[in-house]
Amino acid sequence: MLFRFGSDRWLGVHLGMTGKLSAEPPDHWPGKHDHLILYTRTLALVFQDPRLFGRIRFDCSRQAPKWWSSLPTPVLSREFSIPRLSEILKKRGRTPLKPLLLLQEFFPGIGNWMADEILWQAHLHPRTRAGTLVQPAIAGLHAKIQKISKEAIRIIGRDWSDPPRSWLFLHRWEDGGKCPRCRELLRRQSVGGRTTCWCPACQKAALPRRRSRS
């Protein structure tokens, strides 16, 4: 987020994983995890971040800071279209979907559990290579990226509430957890160096193509 003050003052805020901005009364007293408070006559804008993953930047210039214009396309913007997603998948064709979704230069804001949730809801195996997706699967992946991102902001970003139990989220942490869709035992392994959870029944791995004999 970028805030402008006057003609040449800019404040950039990156929430990170646990950061939160809130509007509080003007007499707000700093809490343990309050790292920036902007006081006005009517309210206090408070930046809280328990795990210190967020960032604050201050710039002085007539134009918006250069780093702002170089940020990747937000996944909830109009520019993040199905053709745009198709380009990314083609460009990183050999990369498995799970580690690809975690690349912030393509999918800013998507973290580990969100990537698992997106793939589970899209019925895609986390090791599926990006370049193997056909158009209906790409459209489905695009829809789930935007749906999960919107719901994460609405549900979790508001007051840290848990998503509904119909999601993978609450079951992916449990030993012996079962898929909320088909009740199959969930599987957890490292994919691309990150702990990954999926349902082997709902997210079947694509069979390797047979080489034609010459």
Q: Which stretches of residues belong to each language-model region?
A:
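Basic, nucleic-acid-binding surfaces and adjacent catalytic neighborhoods in DNA/RNA-processing proteins
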Residues: 86-214
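Short low-complexity stretches enriched in small and charged residues
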Residues: 2, 71-74, 154-157
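Phosphate/anion-contacting hairpin/loop surfaces
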Residues: 11-109, 114-121
